[in-house]
Swiss-Prot record:
Organism: Morone saxatilis
GO biological process, one term: killing of cells of another organism
InterPro entries reported for this sequence: Antimicrobial12
Record carries keyword Secreted: yes
A Pfam family of this chain: Antimicrobial12
Protein name per the record: Moronecidin
Length: 79
């Protein structure tokens, strides 16, 4: 009976502490962080990948345009 009373008293002390001091706060914050990360991976990851692909394609087009201009200048200088 003494153990049960001690357990209940200590539980009350922990629960009456400020939420920032409680261990449960850290667990809750971790769960929220994991949830946000999963959500970002599922929804935002696709958009980020599409944006990176579009940027890569644009860079490739710019490189091809520069090479084409360089080739035309060299050809004009040779003729």
């Amino acid at each position: 009976m003494k153990c049960a009373t001690l357990f209940l008293v200590l539980s009350m002390v922990v629960l009456m502490a400020e939420p920032g001091d409680a261990f449960f706060h850290h667990i809750f914050r971790g769960i929220v962080h994991v949830g946000k990360t999963i959500h970002r991976l599922v929804t935002g990851g696709k958009a980020e990948q599409d944006q990176q692909d579009q940027q890569y394609q644009q860079e490739q087009q710019e490189q091809q345009a520069q090479q084409y201009q360089r080739f035309n200048r060299e050809r004009a200088a040779f003729d």
